Structures are given as structure tokens and as C-alpha cells.
Design a protein with these regions (language model features):
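Conserved AdoMet/S-adenosylmethionine-binding subsite of the radical SAM
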Residues: 93-221, 226-233
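Canonical Radical SAM [4Fe-4S] cluster-binding loop centered on the CxxxCxxC motif
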Residues: 18-64
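Short strand->helix junction
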Residues: 32, 90-91
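Short hydrophobic-acidic sequence motifs that mark active-site Asp/Glu residues
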Residues: 22-24, 82, 142, 180
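Short glycine-rich or small-residue beta-strand-to-loop segments that form or flank ligand, phosphate
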Residues: 83-88
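Conserved alpha-helical substructure of the radical SAM core
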Residues: 46-82, 96-99
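Residues at or immediately flanking beta-strands
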Residues: 79-82, 116, 217, 253
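Auxiliary Fe-S-binding modules of radical SAM enzymes
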Residues: 1-18, 71, 187-258
Length: 258
């Protein structure tokens, strides 16, 4: 099973394709994955294969570990560009997510004021008031929308609970532009069916959704590491560039990771 489980609560720093030198904050257990999606491309593997036995780190554990690591990096003269909530699952699912965001912003302001605070989220819980208020306080509120096709979402993102893409789009609209939309494009098959979302059938409706959401930026990327479903393929640079050009024509800044 060639997938990645990250240390918790702090890992890195790592060089992010999209964010620069990133110090990771993992709010999930250090021995498994807890996520509201079960994506067939997730670098952490399938949920059922990565059931954790350890608890999530507490708010105090996160604050203490982050402060220690930032002080160490400061002493070494190597400060991060960004503090990134990511890791083994959905960060907003942590019961103390909002408080942890408060602590992180305070530590950032005190120890590395030039760094940004980023959250990588699948947006399944972005409608919750306490999650929304916390996400509005971070610099980079990066929310996933791989497609607006309900069947594709069920097959590829595999939500573990109720997921209505139209309701999610309404939630994304409610952020009034304080969000970055992140979308993964890929090719290949899963269980004998195509998962290619680079064609007009998927890209056209997705672009219409972007127009209604009006994000501050769009990040498009493709798979970069081994995936639990082994029949997936990268989208080509040419395909990603063509999609990016269409995003730019809508007036949104776009970054592409190949």
C-alpha cells in the first residue's frame, strides 16, 4: 500500500508546488486518515485502509508543537512561507478547528509575521458557522471543487456523508470571494469507467460554477504521487494550460501545477 501518512500535529517544512516553503499542520491522528471524502486519488490512501487507532491531537498539543517548531526554525534562520493545514484528512472536521486557527494566527503574528496561513479543505463542512468564521480569518482559504457533476463526485471524491454539489456551490458563493478554488484534473479509469474530467462535459459546467462563486484565485493541478487507485493518469500540461486559459478569460488569476 504505497500511500503517505503524515506525522501529527506538525510536519515539514516541505516545498509545496502551489504555496512555497510550507510548514504542515495535521489535525488528524498520526497513524491513519479521517476524512469526509474518500477520493480515489488521495495520496493518503483509502479511508478503510487507513483507520487510525490514535486520537486527534488536542488544541493545546497543536499550539505547543507549532510554537516549538517555529522557534526552532527561527533559531535556524529558516522561516516558512506558509503555515498549511493539511495532512491525513479534512482539517475542518477537528472539533477545535476554530480555536486552533486563532492560536495559529497568534503564533504566526508573533514569530513569523511574513508567513501566510492556509487551509486545504474539501469544503464539506464549510457551511458550518464556526468553520466559516475561521476560514474567513485565514490568508488562503483553499476549497476543493473538482467538478459539478454529481455522478463524478460520487465515483471519484466519494463523500462519506450527504453531499449536494449545488448546496456546496451556494456555500462557496457565500464567502464573497474570500476563497481559492482548487481543482484536480486527471485521466484514466476506475472500476472500468473513465474518470477523465478534462473534456468539455466537465470543464464547461465547472467554469460556469466559477463565475457564480467568483473566487480570488483558482488553482488547477493533477496527480503528482502514487494513488490508491492504480489506473489513474496525469492530465497533460497542454490540457491543463488550455483549461487555465479559459479560467483567465473569465478574469480569475490561475496557477497550474503539472
Amino acid at each position: 500500500m504505497s500511500t503517505i501518512i503524515y506525522p501529527s500535529p506538525i510536519f515539514g517544512p516541505v516545498r509545496s508546488r502551489r504555496l512555497g516553503i510550507s510548514l504542515g499542520i495535521n489535525l488528524m491522528p498520526d497513524d491513519g486518515k479521517v476524512c469526509t471524502f474518500d477520493c480515489i486519488y488521495c495520496e493518503c490512501g483509502f479511508n478503510a485502509d487507513r483507520r487510525p487507532h490514535h486520537p486527534r491531537p488536542t488544541r493545546e498539543m497543536v499550539r505547543t508543537a507549532l510554537e516549538e517548531r517555529l522557534r526552532q526554525m527561527k533559531n535556524e534562520g529558516q522561516m516558512p512561507d506558509v503555515l498549511t493545514f493539511a495532512g491525513n484528512g479534512e482539517p475542518t472536521a477537528h472539533p477545535d478547528f476554530a480555536g486552533i486557527i486563532d492560536d495559529t494566527i497568534a503564533l504566526r503574528d508573533a514569530l513569523c509575521p511574513a508567513a501566510k496561513v492556509s487551509v486545504l479543505s474539501n469544503a464539506t463542512l464549510a457551511h458550518r458557522p464556526e468553520v466559516r468564521e475561521a476560514l474567513l480569518r485565514v490568508d488562503n482559504n483553499i476549497l476543493k471543487l473538482d467538478t459539478v457533476d454529481a455522478d463524478y463526485i460520487q465515483r471519484v471524491n466519494a463523500p462519506t456523508g450527504k453531499y449536494d454539489v449545488n448546496e456546496v456551490i451556494k456555500t462557496l458563493q457565500s464567502y464573497d470571494g474570500h476563497l481559492i478554488i482548487q481543482t484536480l484534473f486527471m485521466k484514466g479509469t476506475s472500476r472500468g469507467r473513465s474518470v477523465d474530467n478534462t473534456g468539455e462535459e466537465y470543464v464547461g459546467p465547472w467554469l460556469k460554477a466559477l463565475e457564480s462563486i467568483a473566487p480570488s484565485q483558482v488553482m488547477i493541478y493533477t496527480i503528482d504521487r502514487e494513488t490508491p487507485d492504480h489506473d489513474l493518469c496525469k492530465a497533460t500540461p497542454e490540457e491543463l494550460d488550455r483549461i487555465a486559459e479559459r479560467v483567465q478569460r473569465l478574469g480569475f488569476p490561475v496557477s497550474v501545477s503539472y
